[in-house]
Amino acid sequence: MTVPSIVLNDGNSIPQLGYGVFKVPPADTQRAVEEALEVGYRHIDTAAIYGNEEGVGAAIAASGIARDDLFITTKLWNDRHDGDEPAAAIAESLAKLALDQVDLYLVHWPTPAADNYVHAWEKMIELRAAGLTRSIGVSNHLVPHLERIVAATGVVPAVNQIELHPAYQQREITDWAAAHDVKIESWGPLGQGKYDLFGAEPVTAAAAAHGKTPAQAVLRWHLQKGFVVFPKSVRRERLEENLDVFDFDLTDTEIAAIDAMDPGDGSGRVSAHPDEVD
């Protein structure tokens, strides 16, 4: 199974479906990533704060897959925004990953109370210029954060990785991203178990119509919206199921029905609010 890629605003390509290792224990990470690579994943998403970059690196090294065939993302943690900390942080991440360069480096959270995310973004631009990452982006950034970093630097992030699922679609952010050619990456795309997305009528109807599981129907909804998506599992059968989403298309009516699952009041949020994370 070959995962389609989409083109970022800097000209680089990114596989539209990847494997995220959030909450994968460090001791289990190498085997989990090895299995994901065996199944066919080529896009791996980690972060410094996850504590499992070394396992990702070990899996990459053991895989025998050419580096050019992989897309590796990691992230700058909140306490590394000041001074030259971003440069030190990416050096540490690269050492743990046993790589010379990542494909995408993200500012993990804006932490607006510290008021240093503009500086962090300026440093990210320098890291890209130095060849330590091919693309740069952000995660969990709201529209005011995005507008501020773009106004300060003139550089638009390639991606914004945000919590996004049918019950919480963050349309203000996705509309802004579409207007500025920023690709959205969905984390928690299946609702993280807080919502019975798989029992919702629009999802079950779409799944039944195409002979797919509810999870596959939700993932297909993300993909047809143009989002990059990271379903997470450590079970091989689920890894395979999550990858088997490129042989069907939801109808416009099915997409509209899933769109309507968001009540629009923000109640679908599972994670912390970006303005409150420090």
Curated annotation (Swiss-Prot):
Catalytic residues (UniProt): 50 (proton donor)
Annotated positions binding substrate: 108
PROSITE patterns, per the entry: ALDOKETO_REDUCTASE_1
Application of this enzyme or protein: Introduced by genetic manipulation and expressed in Erwinia herbicola by Anderson et al. The resultant organism is able to convert in a single fermentative step D-glucose into 2-keto-L-gulonic acid, a key precursor in the industrial production of L-ascorbic acid (vitamin C). However, the technology still needs some working on and is not used in commercial production at present.
Signal peptide limits: none
Region (Disordered) location: 259-278
Record has Cytoplasm as a keyword: yes
InterPro entries named in the record: AKR, AKR5C1, Aldo/ket_reductase_CS, NADP_OxRdtase_dom, NADP_OxRdtase_dom_sf
Molecular function GO terms recorded: aldo-keto reductase (NADPH) activity
Keyword ATP-binding included in the entry's annotation: no
Functional pH dependence: Optimum pH is 6.4. Active over a broad pH range.
Gene3D superfamilies, sorted: NADP-dependent oxidoreductase domain (3.20.20.100)
Keywords for this protein: Ascorbate biosynthesis, Cytoplasm, NADP, Oxidoreductase
Reaction(s) this enzyme catalyzes, per UniProt: 2-dehydro-L-idonate + NADP(+) = 2,5-didehydro-D-gluconate + NADPH + H(+)
EC numbers for this chain: 1.1.1.346
GO annotation, cellular component aspect: cytoplasm
Annotated control of activity: Inhibited by Zn(2+), Fe(3+), Cu(2+) and Ni(2+).
Further details from the record: Modeling study indicates that the active site may not be optimized for 2,5-diketo-D-gluconic acid.
Subunit structure and binding partners: Monomer.
PANTHER family xref list: 2,5-DIKETO-D-GLUCONIC ACID REDUCTASE, NADP-DEPENDENT OXIDOREDUCTASE DOMAIN-CONTAINING PROTEIN
Main function: Catalyzes the reduction of 2,5-diketo-D-gluconic acid (25DKG) to 2-keto-L-gulonic acid (2KLG). 5-keto-D-fructose and dihydroxyacetone can also serve as substrates. 25DKGR-A exhibits a greater selectivity for the substrate and higher thermal stability than 25DKGR-B.
Name the record gives this protein: 2,5-diketo-D-gluconic acid reductase A
Upper classification of the organism: Bacteria, Bacillati, Actinomycetota, Actinomycetes, Mycobacteriales
